[in-house]
Curated annotation (Swiss-Prot):
Lineage: Eukaryota, Amoebozoa, Evosea, Eumycetozoa, Dictyostelia
Domain of life: Eukaryota
GO MF annotation terms: C-8 sterol isomerase activity; cholestenol delta-isomerase activity; steroid Delta-isomerase activity
Protein name: Probable 3-beta-hydroxysteroid-Delta(8),Delta(7)-isomerase
Domain EXPERA: 25-188
PANTHER family: 3-BETA-HYDROXYSTEROID-DELTA(8),DELTA(7)-ISOMERASE, STEROL ISOMERASE
Gene: ebp
Organism expressing this protein natively: Dictyostelium discoideum
Keyword Glycoprotein: no
Catalytic activity line of the entry: lathosterol = 5alpha-cholest-8-en-3beta-ol; zymosterol = 5alpha-cholesta-7,24-dien-3beta-ol
Job of this protein: Catalyzes the conversion of Delta(8)-sterols to their corresponding Delta(7)-isomers.
Recorded topology in the membrane: Multi-pass membrane protein
Length: 219
């Protein structure tokens, strides 16, 4: 049996949507964490392990790649997910030359993926460690994205490695990767606001307790 190449990715995205709809609070945050976690582990993790199998960039368009007919068993084959990066290598050549920094961060994505799923549980249960873990995860995601963008500039390889086509550059390179900078910034701000609010409550409670303890007792 054959399916279109985009089907496994669409099913995973739909699964994240369905699960997030059953959550009582912060549905968008839960969706982002689930979707991000799956991408970190299934896509980027697969590339990290099998980067050596991606040796050249694809010559077809993204639409043609997604509409290719592939065997159904590819849906759970990490080698196939790694091979999808031959398409992305068309926009960022580093994925076709096993760039050490890219491969390293793809292995780090496995940690991020696990943290995403753990954070989903913390969000649902409103666990005390939620915002500490959220800041930790967002820091790693943001740092990885910054390194992704600046290293071609640092080594003067941007024109050689990154597509010069405006659409491919701004949609596939800047747009897609920029999500892992923009959303972590938003979630980090959310965490700082929540932590500050909790400190204010504790401080207010402490002051009230001290005031009551100092209040003279009436006979």
């Amino acid at each position: 049996m054959e399916i279109f190449a985009f089907v496994p990715l669409a099913v995973l995205t739909a699964l994240c949507v369905v699960i997030s709809l059953f959550v009582k609070r912060e549905k968008l945050v839960v969706f982002w964490l689930l979707w991000s976690g799956l991408i970190h582990i299934i896509l980027e993790g697969s590339y990290g392990f099998f980067a050596h199998e991606v040796t050249k960039a694809s010559t077809v368009s993204f639409t043609e790649k997604m509409l290719e007919l592939v065997p159904l068993e590819n849906a759970w084959n990490p080698h196939w997910y790694a091979q999808l990066y031959s398409q992305y290598a068309k926009y960022d050549l580093r994925y076709a030359i096993q760039d050490p920094m890219v491969v390293f961060f793809c292995f780090l994505e496995l940690v991020q993926g696990a943290a995403c799923f753990l954070l989903v549980i913390c969000v649902i249960k409103q666990a005390r460690i939620r915002h500490a873990l959220q800041i930790f995860l967002c820091s790693i995601q943001g740092l990885g994205t910054v390194f992704y963008f600046i290293t071609p500039y640092i080594y003067g390889l941007w024109e050689q490695q990154i597509s010069s086509d405006p659409f491919e550059l701004w949609v596939y390179v800047v747009g897609l990767n920029g999500l892992w900078l923009l959303v972590p910034i938003i979630l980090t701000i959310q965490s700082f606001i929540a932590i500050n609010k909790q400190f204010s409550i504790v401080e207010s409670t402490t002051k009230d307790a001290k005031f009551i303890s100092r209040k003279p007792k009436t006979a």
